[in-house]
Amino acid sequence: MAVTDGDSITAAQYNGLQSRINTVMGTGSGDDGYGQVLASSQVSAGDIITAANFDNLRTDLNKANNHQSGTNAAIGDIAVGQIIGADASGTDLASLNVTTEGFNDYDAAVGVIETNKLLLNAGNSSVEAATTSQRTAAWGGGGGGTVNHTFTVTFADANARRHFFNAGGEIRFSATRTGGSGSKDTDWSTLLTNMGTIKMNRTQTTSTGSGTGTSIGNSDLTGTYQQIFSKSGSGLYAENLYRIQARQDSTSVLRFNVDFQDNDLGDDQGGAGSTGPVDENVTGTLTSTIQQLRATGSNVSVATPTYTNTANL
């Protein structure tokens, strides 16, 4: 809450600012909270608010703003000996044009951070390998077939899961098929290449390529599998399907099922003299790759979960 020119800044007002940044940077609840340890803390009623108090608060604001946008908050450093004003600070009237050092400037900076709490600047994150599954044996053909890659993502607790996604974390999916030269092999390779990388964040699942995403993210998961993404084949192989399903096993464990459905039942490709539809196997090497985008660095860094394969391709 802003203060009026001429008013004293009370412990309660400082604590109000500190509480708001703690909601974003600390444990929080729901879509608030990155799970970080703050430099600032509450002060006691009647305490004089010092430059050191504001230095610690500024540290927390700068870390949060950097995490979100890559720059420090629009506030100045308050030096020892300065008087903290409503909209400026200084040791005498002549220096009160320092317009980023007042209490209200800090108040406004916290407001920006609250608005941008779910943003993540790319420079404050890392894309990291999580798990993979690979198959070299032929599959599909002969009337259809499905191979699956199922894995769990285990967080330390429900808060750690929430902090991972609140801080901009994503679980990412991609796949490739190499080797082999059949037309079905080629279609699967094209399907997997064209879908790009699939990204599940806090509230949605999208892809960098083509396919059907959903408005289902971490906060929408239940104890029952939900389809969060799909991508179909094309032409003669339009029935073939790559699909991702997701559910929560508990408040701290997510489970994903990635299936590759060879639903094509064969097409009459043989020309004159053919005996009927031909349904080829899928050959070559099929790889399902899982990565994560995680908030990292000196501003906000969240713990990585553990990835465990429970079914391989």
Residue ranges of predicted features:
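Detector for Asparagine
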Residues: 15, 22, 53-56, 62-66, ...
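Extended, charged low-complexity segments
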Residues: 203-313
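Extracellular "spike/adhesin" assembly and maturation modules
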Residues: 1-136, 140
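Long, charge-rich C-terminal accessory regions
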Residues: 111-253
